[in-house]
Amino acid sequence: MKTTIQILTCKLITNVCKLFKKNGTVYPGSIALKINGKVLESIKYPKYVIGVTGSSGKGSTTSMLAHILKDNGLNVVWNSSGSNVLNGTATLILNNTNAFTHKLKADVLLLEMDESYIKKTFTKSTLTHLVITNITRDQPARNGEPEIILNKILSSIDENTEVIINADDPFVNRFSFLHKGPVCTYGINKTSYDLKKPISNNVDAAYCPICHKKLKYTSYHYGHLGVYSCPTKDFVRKTDFTGDNLNLENKEMIINGNKVKLNKDVFFAAYYTLAAYSAASEIGLTDTQIMHALNENTLESKRLKTLKLDNREVDMLESKNENNLSYVQSLNYINNHKGPKTIIMGFDNVSRRYKYNDISWLYAVSYTH
């Protein structure tokens, strides 16, 4: 009875919020959780409960995966609003759950999830799949070191969850031997856009986590993501789903022998497309089904908007605040487009989210490369 009351309360508050033209994506769930903080444990979830997490790219990956699944006729409940912490997730789940049977009405529950909130949201065995995009230096005042985030994610799941990981990131690739359940890996082979040396001398995850010798990189995609090997072969970069022949000018690449369109001519578009492809395949979709969604019904990019202003074309890029690699990718996009251009950059130079006046992440951005 308590669960029924919580579900009805959440739905009622959501409708009241909409009546007053408020989003109502977070507050209703917070009220429901105050009644019973463990209400999400009482929900009957669908066969597939997929989480997507990481320092950056989780929103784009979630959107792309939702597009692929819906294009193939699956009923997908997902947090399209971007509310990825506990209260927002609770609002989404309760609003899509039958108040009397407590069954979530979907084929797939797909969630963009903040790395620090997975454990606070679900019990360890709730997620059937977890996609991990990358682990980088991100929002340092809140998250601290990348190692802390890795351990938070690892402690949030058990052997019942399949992890789908970006093997190009040595931090994330540690799940290949630390996680006790099934592991699926994806990565992008050497491209014409790679660097032989990193932009910054302070590269995270530069050493093998097993033998502790310095990793040997054939090439760097960006940051510490790239093609690498351990000198003693203790730590292996292996990919089940592989991106080849990346062509940003034509917005395409090859995934496991199939030519795939990208919806944006930036490197991280290749990553979130490959991650979504891998996850969709792991839950049973065929290459043909995935290719149709990517190549025939292309998803419009939300992070890159093109506008017209006084007969000029304006590209507006959205980068994640307090994440240096996200800014670097935007700068790479600008640098790769030749010809004269006017550049306007904006950011909150001091974090307003915490009591700390943290600006350290700005110094890790290479503005002159």
Name each region found by the language model.
Residues T191-K251:
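Cys/His-rich short segments
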Residues G59-H67, D244-G257:
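Acidic-glycine-rich active-site phosphate/pyrophosphate-binding loop
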Residues N247-L248, A279-S319:
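Gly/charged, well-structured mid-domain segments that form the phosphate/adenylate-handling core
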Residues V76-N79, K259-F267, D315-M316:
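A short glycine/serine-rich beta->alpha loop
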Residues E318-H369:
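Active-site beta-alpha connecting loops in nucleotide-dependent enzymes
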Residues K124-N134, H224-K238, K264-N295:
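A conserved, hydrophobic alpha-helical segment in the catalytic core
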Residues K2-G187, K197-Y207:
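Phosphate-binding loop of NTP-binding sites
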